[in-house]
Amino acid sequence: MKFLVCIKQVVDTSKMEVDPETGRLKRNNANSIMNPVDLNALEAALSLRDRIGGTVTVITMGPPQAEAVLRDAVAMGADDIYLVTDRAFGGADTLATSYTLAAAISKIGMPDLIFCGIESIDSNTAQIGPEIAATLGIADVSGASFISFEKEGGLIVTRQNGSSAEVVELKLPAVVTVLPELNKPRYSSIKGILGKGDAELHIITAADLDIDTARIGIKGSPTQVKRVRPVVPPQKENLRIEEKDPQESVDIPVSYTHLRAHETK
């Protein structure tokens, strides 16, 4: 069984900045990590591989430094890693990104099952998984909270739909995006950490793919951030009481609250 996991290197949200001129995230000189829920997607693939056999391939699209999260995936147990990187891919929105990733997946070879985290912490669109499935012409289920693999080759997925849950049966190949509550990602082994630097890194560039260059990078991205502004939380109105008489200190806030209640009616 061939499993493939799409992961993303993201800026640590505590260090995140947006370029006000371009409306894009500043990724240089910022702390970067693997998107947290992508760890759950990777764990889902590794767990199934350990149970039924197969291989786990991990892919990411990004700048050369995104290699770091692929090495982290190797430390957890991934078998093969692919970095899709090219200046031509820069500035891609979800549509251009999913198109490029789908082309890279086709080049690698169609897996039986593709896992993605449901969304990234730097954009929260939850679009990449479904768009990859649509581009490849295969089924997808988003928001998986439980997965059961059937012997006949099908997949039973429980997905959250608001306050209710749906049970979906999938025929492979398919894409599944997962929720954090699906599992608890394993820790990297000492052997994995020591050996992650030795794993072969496969590089895929624009020249390696059979793609329409008008559909990649900024040119292929109809979605643009037009304005970025800080959100200032509303200030609460404060009342300071400076009365020596304890009874007056009690009467004042009661009267003030009574007055405000009438003003808001």
Predicted segments, located by residue:
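N-terminal beta-strand-loop-alpha-helix module at the start
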Residues: M1-M61
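A glycine-rich helix N-cap at a beta->alpha junction
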Residues: V69-L95
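Short Gly/Thr/Asp-enriched flexible loops that form oxyanion-binding sites at enzyme active sites
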Residues: S123-L136
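Short, acidic/small-residue loops that bind anionic groups at enzyme active sites
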Residues: A134-E152
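Anionic-ligand binding region
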Residues: G153-P173
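A charged, well-structured terminal subsegment
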Residues: E169-G197
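Accessory alpha-helical/coil subdomains and C-terminal extensions
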Residues: D198-N238
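Conserved small/polar residues in nucleotide/adenosyl-binding loops
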Residues: T257-T264
